[in-house]
C-alpha cells in the first residue's frame, strides 16, 4: 500500500513589519485644519497637530523655503509621531528625509557633507519631458527566429485603435522587450519611440472571454481611441542629491544603488544649481522644496548649528523640522548652556511647536490603536490595567507589553488577553523605576558601582589617607584632609 505524503503548509512571514509609528496614516485634520480627537492613528495634541497642519500646507504651496520648526516636549509626548504624520499627509510626491542627530558623525564623511546631502535629498525637481509614444491593442504579432538560434530576430506587429490599424516592423531590441513582457494578441501596450521601452497596460475587454480563468494580476482595459502615435508629457521627479551623485565623476550612476557616495565637490553642486534654475526659467522643471526632519537635534554640535544657520538662508533650502526632549542644557562642543541645547541665534530663526503629556483617556486610545495594529484582542479590564501601567511608568513600556502579553495569551491557547496575562508580563519585564530601585538596593553586588561612603585605609598598607572608589572606572583617588 502506497504511503500518503504529508504536506506541511507554513505561513509566509509578512514583509511589512509593525513599527513604533506604523499605525499613523496622517495628522488627523479636517478641511479647515481643525484636529479631530482620534483620527488617522493620531490621538490628542490638538494644538501641535494643527500647527503641523499649517506647516504641511506651507510645504504643499512650495513658495516658502528655508523655514525651521522645532518640536519641543517631554519624552513620550508624540514628537516623532507628528513628524511621521506630516510625512504621510504630504504623500510620496513631496520629498521627506528623516534622520537622527547622531547620524552625521562618521569617519568616512564630514559632518557638513552629511548635512548637505540630507538637505539636498529633501529638495525635489520635477522635470517635464514630451515623448512620442505608440499606444494600441495588439491584433497580431509575428517573430521570425533564425534556424541556428543565433543572429538577429525580425518581426511584425499589427496594432489598432478604435479608428485605425497599422503594421509595424520590429527590430531586435523591441522584440527582446516584447518577449520579456510576454506580449500576445489582445494586449493593450505602449511603445516609447525614443527609448524603445514597452509597457503592458492590460488585456482588451474584447478578449475577456478568451480564457475561462485568469489570474488576479490580469487587468482589463478599453481599446485606445484616436491616433496610434501620440505625444505625451512625462514628469520625472528626482531629488537634487540624486542629480549630484549621477554627475559626480568619482562615483557616477552606480553610487545610487551602492549608497557609497562619499564627498561631493561644491563646484558640482553649484553647476547643478545653476542648471536647475535655468530649467525653471525655461519652464522645463519645477523645484519642489520638501521636508528634512532631524530627531534628537540636541546631539548636533556647534559647527553643525553654524552650518545650518547659513544653509537655511539659501534659496535651495527645504523646510527643516527638528525635535528635542531636552530643557536648558549644554550646547555640544561648548561650555555654554541654552534652551534645548540649541544656540540662541538659531532658536531665533525657529518657530517652536510644543507637545504636552497625554491624559489617561488619550493614553487608553493610543493603546487601543496599537492593539488593533498588532492584531491583539484585549479585554477591557486588561486595557485599563495597561493604561494604569502607562501612566505610572511610560507609554513606550506599556506598548511593548502588548506583544508580550499576546504571546502569553496564545501560549495558553486563548484568543483574548486578560488581566492575568498583563500582570504576568509586568512581573517578568521591569520598567525603569523598578530597575533603578533594585540597583539601589543591590548596588554593592554589581561591578564598578559607586561607593559614596568613605572607607578608612588600613594603616598597615601604608599611609592614613582616606580613599574612595569613583563610579565607572573603579580608580581609587586620595582625598585631601
From Swiss-Prot:
InterPro entries the record matches: AAA+_ATPase, P-loop_NTPase, RuvB-like, RuvB-like_C, RuvBL1/2_DNA/RNA_bd_dom, TIP49_P-loop
GO CC terms of this entry: histone acetyltransferase complex; Ino80 complex; NuA4 histone acetyltransferase complex; nucleus; R2TP complex; Swr1 complex
E.C. no: 3.6.4.12
SMART domains: AAA
Main location: nucleus
Catalytic activity: ATP + H2O = ADP + phosphate + H(+)
Location of the region described as Disordered in the Swiss-Prot/TrEMBL record: 453-481
Subunit structure: Forms homohexameric rings. May form a dodecamer with rept made of two stacked hexameric rings. Component of the chromatin remodeling Ino80 complex. Interacts with Myc and pont.
Function per UniProt: Acts as a transcriptional coactivator in Wg signaling caused by altered arm signaling. Pont and rept interfere antagonistically with nuclear arm signaling function, and are required to enhance or reduce arm activity, respectively. Also an essential cofactor for the normal function of Myc; required for cellular proliferation and growth.
Protein's UniProt name: RuvB-like helicase 2
Annotated organism of origin: Drosophila melanogaster
Lineage: Eukaryota, Metazoa, Ecdysozoa, Arthropoda, Hexapoda
Amino acid at each position: 500500500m502506497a504511503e500518503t505524503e504529508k504536506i506541511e503548509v507554513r505561513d509566509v512571514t509578512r514583509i511589512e513589519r509593525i513599527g513604533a509609528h506604523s499605525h499613523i496614516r496622517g495628522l488627523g485634520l479636517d478641511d479647515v485644519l481643525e484636529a479631530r480627537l482620534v483620527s488617522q492613528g493620531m490621538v490628542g495634541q490638538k494644538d501641535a497637530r494643527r500647527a503641523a497642519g499649517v506647516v504641511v500646507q506651507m510645504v504643499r504651496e512650495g513658495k516658502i523655503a528655508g523655514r525651521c520648526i522645532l518640536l519641543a516636549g517631554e519624552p513620550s509626548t508624540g514628537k516623532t509621531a507628528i513628524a511621521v504624520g506630516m510625512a504621510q499627509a504630504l504623500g510620496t510626491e513631496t520629498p521627506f528625509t528623516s534622520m537622527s542627530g547622531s547620524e552625521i558623525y562618521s569617519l568616512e564623511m564630514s559632518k557638513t557633507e552629511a548635512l548637505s546631502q540630507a538637505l539636498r535629498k529633501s529638495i525635489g525637481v520635477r522635470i517635464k519631458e514630451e515623448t512620442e509614444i505608440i499606444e494600441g491593442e495588439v491584433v497580431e504579432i509575428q517573430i521570425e527566429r533564425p534556424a541556428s538560434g543565433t543572429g538577429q530576430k525580425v518581426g511584425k506587429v499589427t496594432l489598432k485603435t478604435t479608428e485605425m490599424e497599422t503594421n509595424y516592423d520590429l527590430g531586435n531590441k523591441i522584440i527582446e522587450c516584447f518577449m520579456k513582457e510576454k506580449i500576445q494578441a489582445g494586449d493593450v501596450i505602449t511603445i516609447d519611440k525614443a527609448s524603445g521601452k514597452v509597457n503592458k497596460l492590460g488585456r482588451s475587454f474584447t478578449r475577456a472571454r478568451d480564457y475561462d480563468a485568469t489570474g488576479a494580476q490580469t487587468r482589463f482595459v478599453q481599446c485606445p481611441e484616436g491616433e496610434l502615435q501620440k505625444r505625451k508629457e512625462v514628469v520625472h521627479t528626482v531629488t537634487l542629491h540624486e542629480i549630484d551623485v549621477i554627475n559626480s565623476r568619482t562615483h557616477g550612476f552606480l553610487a545610487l544603488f551602492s549608497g557609497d557616495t562619499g564627498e561631493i565637490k561644491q563646484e558640482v553642486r553649484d553647476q547643478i544649481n545653476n542648471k536647475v534654475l535655468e530649467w525653471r526659467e525655461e519652464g522645463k522643471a519645477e523645484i519642489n522644496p520638501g521636508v528634512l526632519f532631524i530627531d534628537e537635534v540636541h546631539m548636533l554640535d556647534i559647527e553643525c548649528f553654524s552650518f545650518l544657520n547659513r544653509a537655511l538662508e539659501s534659496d535651495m533650502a527645504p523646510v527643516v523640522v527638528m525635535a528635542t526632549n531636552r530643557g536648558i542644557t549644554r550646547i555640544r562642543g561648548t561650555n555654554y548652556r541654552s534652551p534645548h541645547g540649541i544656540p540662541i541665534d538659531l532658536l531665533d530663526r525657529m518657530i517652536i511647536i510644543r507637545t504636552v503629556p497625554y491624559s489617561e483617556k488619550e493614553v487608553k486610545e493610543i493603546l487601543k490603536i496599537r492593539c488593533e495594529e498588532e492584531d491583539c484582542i484585549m479585554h477591557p479590564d486588561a486595557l485599563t490595567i495597561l493604561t494604569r501601567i502607562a501612566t505610572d511608568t511610560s507609554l513606550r513600556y506599556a506598548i511593548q507589553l502588548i506583544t508580550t502579553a499576546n504571546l502569553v495569551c496564545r501560549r495558553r491557547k486563548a484568543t483574548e488577553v486578560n488581566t492575568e496575562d498583563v500582570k504576568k508580563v509586568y512581573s517578568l519585564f521591569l520598567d525603569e523605576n523598578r530597575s533603578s530601585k533594585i540597583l539601589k538596593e543591590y548596588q554593592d553586588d554589581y561591578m564598578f558601582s559607586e561607593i559614596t561612603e568613605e572607607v578608612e585605609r588600613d594603616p598597615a598598607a601604608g599611609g592614613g589617607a582616606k580613599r574612595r572608589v569613583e563610579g565607572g572606572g573603579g580608580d581609587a583617588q586620595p582625598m585631601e584632609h
